[in-house]
Amino acid sequence: MAATAASTMSAAAAVTRRINAALRVDATSGDVAAGADGQNGRRSPVAKRVNDGGGGKDDVWVAVDEKDVCGARGGDGAARPPLFRTYKVKGSILHPYRFLILLRLIAIVAFFAWRVRHKNRDGVWLWTMSMVGDVWFGFSWVLNQLPKLSPIKRVPDLAALADRHSGDLPGVDVFVTTVDPVDEPILYTVNTILSILAADYPVDRYACYLSDDGGTLVHYEAMVEVAKFAELWVPFCRKHCVEPRSPENYFAMKTQAYKGGVPGELMSDHRRVRREYEEFKVRIDSLSSTIRQRSDVYNAKHAGENATWMADGTHWPGTWFEPADNHQRGKHAGIVQVLLNHPSCKPRLGLAASAENPVDFSGVDVRLPMLVYISREKRPGYNHQKKAGAMNVMLRVSALLSNAPFVINFDGDHYVNNSQAFRAPMCFMLDGRGRGGENTAFVQFPQRFDDVDPTDRYANHNRVFFDGTMLSLNGLQGPSYLGTGTMFRRVALYGVEPPRWGAAASQIKAMDIANKFGSSTSFVGTMLDGANQERSITPLAVLDESVAGDLAALTACAYEDGTSWGRDVGWVYNIATEDVVTGFRMHRQGWRSVYASVEPAAFRGTAPINLTERLYQILRWSGGSLEMFFSHSNALLAGRRLHPLQRVAYLNMSTYPIVTVFIFFYNLFPVMWLISEQYYIQRPFGEYLLYLVAVIAMIHVIGMFEVKWAGITLLDWCRNEQFYMIGSTGVYPTAVLYMALKLVTGKGIYFRLTSKQTTASSGDKFADLYTVRWVPLLIPTIVIIVVNVAAVGVAVGKAAAWGPLTEPGWLAVLGMVFNVWILVLLYPFALGVMGQWGKRPAVLFVAMAMAVAAVAAMYVAFGAPYQAELSGGAASLGKAAASLTGPSG
């Protein structure tokens, strides 16, 4: 018996060595050499440079001098390397970048002074409005630019982590949230769970929790199917070291770089697993009809019932297809089901190939992580707080079932793209050599997206933010929490302050536990263990009725009544951007955060490519930002533990929609050019335009430096500029209006869930890009486009009627530059509202040219004679007045 166990352990160790050899890690850069990225193996420029070592060949980033000391020594007394490397922008780029920022600040002040000295007496109201707008533009630019002065990149060293924590990695609880199997297609969710179960992390040291906020039997039975298919998929991933470990994305790749140890078996195993996956997808797609058919059979046997039935012949305790009392959305019991029990600590090798088991797993550890399905109780009269409420329930339930000291959260449409993604944040959390590891509340990864249209029409990749702004915050107190792809320290979620302000255990003991965390003694009893970052997962020995009662209490609606949940504990409530505010609360307490750079990307997800859905998405974000400003989470109210420039960054995040009100009206100013010749924002108008061109050009030059150090492309930057203008002409002003109504009426703002539809039925994965969903939110931007097209037509008409060298003519041409610039920025929106015609951009150009020509012809025919008549009349009145008053002086 002992010999058998020894041989089993030896075989498992050999497999582990083989996998670790295949998944080799570059010790300098932390690059995981494991297959191609989800985007056909393409690397982003910034990742490629850093993973080349950040050394001599890198023309942007340079490694910060870090000595391998600080008391971190191995058993032989040798200094151990740090668990992550820090890079800063080279001075040859950073210093000119900072100088340009200072120069533009001086130019803005000079521009304001010039405008005050040349006050427009003809239209004081117009001049005043534009002056207020320009001052706010300058202020918002300063808020946006100051936090970007010291960008920092941090790259985990997975080889160093393996050397120092090869067998004692701490436990991790992984949270996944979903609501609606229609708006969030269930195929995304099952692939997310499968990628998590197959992650390269000690299988007995992490657990996966799915929160189904809709309480649907479809989601539950999909997880049952996942648990079955994972018995094949996870060992296959371990045997062949496949990347990525989401089956849908893995099988969609045309080529894969093989890193496993048995290449001769890959093709046969690949064919077998792919066939099983296709059958698995068929079962997932047919779940709804299967459950309905089963329920019809059971309901026929029980006259008068219209229930939804589980496979074991019992009523589903959640929502039913036909709503009934206690079985409908917003009113159903809580559910906690352990679908996969916690595995043993010893490896369990699979079976050799046979007729019943075509895939040989004899040398592969076939254990699976713990998998738990959760649907919290919902009752009328309670505000269930959407995603934040679901996350807090998972935080409590996981404390009883696994209580890992670290937590990672995912949206249901994000998957693990890099199998070592759970190891990477540990490099920052566990590096306590005076480098802030113990004071790190969370590690945020960039968000990367699949199936975005090739030109990224609506800036879904948002690289300016993810690779620019977030790296800038990395040089301060850390990035903001972005809602998904984030590892937390559990005690930070409990509202405990960082160790620099006191040990976690002593803080917890000093708290008013019942009033802060609720009445569950079982949950409270887990808190001290959860504060130990060295802790693994120690599951409950028996899930008996008493534990079931505790779990029911923790998922109940009333549990949080009279407690600090949603305010000082867990995810923050009563705000649309609960992610940003939750991260802000931790920063306000003095915690730090880290923005991690790994290659391939740690996680990938989906993004809405439909114009309407994308606009609703940023409406929710901008509305939540304003809610943050007008709440107790205002950055101005934070204490001294918040870094000064971090405060500026949060202030910018919570006020940026306000500036767009002025942008919106600026875009409408050309209307006055259509009405009269007398309205000018500023005189002398030509000099004013030259000032504007200079100030705007400087911000674009600064942007080119950011493009350089952020490693993004010019297309990324241009798309960001375009979509900012699209948001500024409709969405952001709408968010400001919503916030004003909330302040007046006291009623909250409802923001709809972003729909991420699949397009498999059409055969075109970009079909949503050319679908027009008409909503009122589109109207303001359409009006802006019409006004500026008309203004261009009038300008062309003036140049034709008066001559381009006359004062009216050349002023019209100068003004037309502004109108054309606005139209260029709104070009993606115009394509979007064209629907299927958007596939042919030439149609748009022809239509606009015809519209401009028509307006110009109308101006020449009707407007120019009228203006000439007005000018002639004004001249006659002037002569008459002169004859009456006589010569002056």
From Swiss-Prot:
One example of a Gene Ontology biological process annotation: cell wall organization
Binding site for substrate: 411, 413
Function: Catalyzes both beta-1,3 and beta-1,4 glycosidic linkage on beta-D-glucan. Essential for (1,3;1,4)-beta-D-glucans synthesis in grasses and cereals (Poaceae). The mixed-linked glucans (which are not present in walls of dicotyledons or most other monocotyledonous plants) are particularly important constituents of the walls of the starchy endosperm and aleurone cells of cereal grains such as oats, wheat, rice and barley. They can account for up to 70% by weight of the wall.
Coiled-coil stretches: 265-293
Region called Disordered, residue ranges: 34-53
Family of the protein in this entry: Belongs to the glycosyltransferase 2 family. Plant cellulose synthase-like F subfamily.
Enzyme category, top tier: transferase
The keyword Cell wall biogenesis/degradation belongs to this UniProt entry's keyword annotation: yes
UniProt name for this protein: Mixed-linked glucan synthase 2
Main localisation: Golgi
